[in-house]
């Protein structure tokens, strides 16, 4: 998976032009599943869109990351800053025991529900956790 962060006054509108998603309607701390569309409405790839710290944080598929990033760059709007976070790792911890595993590491997910995103510390390491999946 690759992580791309978008910020700026036109970030919502730019991403709304590339996906069928009400990006402006994604509240702070929330995540939505979406897909990139081509000019005729065909699906190019799927992605996750999160709003955290006032910016859009995208997770795109590893196998198509270069294509997805190029697609974003081709349609990059004025007033939008795009940062590809290649220095960040993504770990998918999935399944019904995932909250228990994180609890053993001191992470309390009580009140943290499906399709939310937030900041947590795991063993003293600052992390961003989404409670999502598809």
What are these regions (language model features)?
Residues 1-134:
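Basic, glycine/lysine-rich polyanion-binding surfaces/domains
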